[in-house]
Every structure is written in C-alpha cells, then in structure tokens.
Amino acid sequence: VGQVSQNGKIIKVAKAPGMKYTHYAPKVDTVTAVNIDHAVNEYDKQASLGKNPVIVARDIYRDTVKDRNLISLGVTVEDYTRNIYSALHTAEKEYDYIIVEELHGSGLEASVMNRVTKAAGGKEV
C-alpha cells in the first residue's frame, strides 16, 4: 500500500488490485497442513481439545483420514481448484476448525495455495 496526497491529506492507495480487497476467509479457525500426516495429527489434537474439526483434502487421502471428518476436494489438482471455496464455505457452517491440504508445486498449485494460505491467515501445521 502506498501513500498519496489528495487535497492536502495523505491517503493510502493499493499498489495492486489484490491488495485492495480482503480475500475470503472462513469465520472459524483455519490452518493449512504441510502433508496429510500433519493434518491428521492436528485433527486429533483439536478433537482432544473438544473441537469439531474437519480435514479438507483430495480423495487420495481418504484411507489415511479414515473415520475422521473429511470434505473431499475430488481427485485432481483441477478438482481441488474447482472445489476449494465451496468446501471451505461448507466446512465453516458444519465444523469449528478447518485443516486444509496444502498443494506443492508451481503454476496452478502455487496460485491456488496463495489464495488458500490467505484464507487460513497464513497459519500452517
């Protein structure tokens, strides 16, 4: 954010459109998980504290997540991209702690993770 003088008053101006508006963030605590093992450990920790957590991840992790709450993002990175925001909206209505699978890579993965990281307020497990 930069400063500009207008009519003798200093005002702040966004340097880029992405800085102008706040991005969507769930109203409940949300974190990203480096890998599915971290997600499961965080889930178990939060459940032991009395929270009602959910893991938001792709189907490839269904066997690892087992009987824990899971909102599926589909199979592919493209599915993840299409489904992430509707999954977050659903999660914040039904659960009080959201753990989101991180994607690793460049291109589409990095672009999506930029938004997901902002939605989680930069919190990672």
Model-derived segments and their meaning:
Residues K15-G121, V125:
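A C-terminal functional module that forms or caps the active site or interfaces directly
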Residues I11-V13:
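NAD(P)-dependent aldehyde/semialdehyde dehydrogenase
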Residues V1-V4:
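A conserved active-site cap/scaffold subdomain adjacent to cofactor or substrate pockets
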